[in-house]
Amino acid sequence: MSKKVLVVGVFDLFHRGHVEFLKKAATFGDELIILINGDEMTEKYKRRPIYSEQDRAAILSALSCVTVVEITNSFDVKPYIEKYNIDVIVHGNDWEHDSYLEQIRCTEEYLRQQNVTMAYTDYHSSVSTSALLKQIKEL
C-alpha cells in the first residue's frame, strides 16, 4: 500500500523554493497530494493571487513528483485526509506546530485517530513569493 503525503499552500508565483519544498515533501511517501488554496480563500486571508487557482493547479500538475492537485476554499483539510487516506502532512517549518494545526482545522487527537503524522521541512525565506513581489515592485 502506498504512503500518501499531503501539502497545502497557495503556490502563487511558482519559484525554486516551491520546487525544493515539493521535492522534499515527496520523499515522505509514494504519492504527493497538493491542496491549493483557492482564489477566494487566499484573497481573504493573504492577498489576491497573481496567478489564478486554475493556472496554479496546471503548473503543479505538470510536476513529475505530484500525484493529485485539488483546489480548496476551506482551511479544513479533514475531508481530504479521509478522501485520500493521508499518512503524512508536510509543511515548512516557518509555522509553529500548534498554529499550523489550528490553520488546517485539525487536532492532535484527530491526527492520531487517522494515523496521520506531521513533518516539517526547512523554510528558505530568501526564496519566497513575498520576496519576489517586493523585487517586482522595486523595478
Residue spans for each PLM region:
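Nucleotidyltransferase catalytic core that binds NTPs
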Residues: 1-139
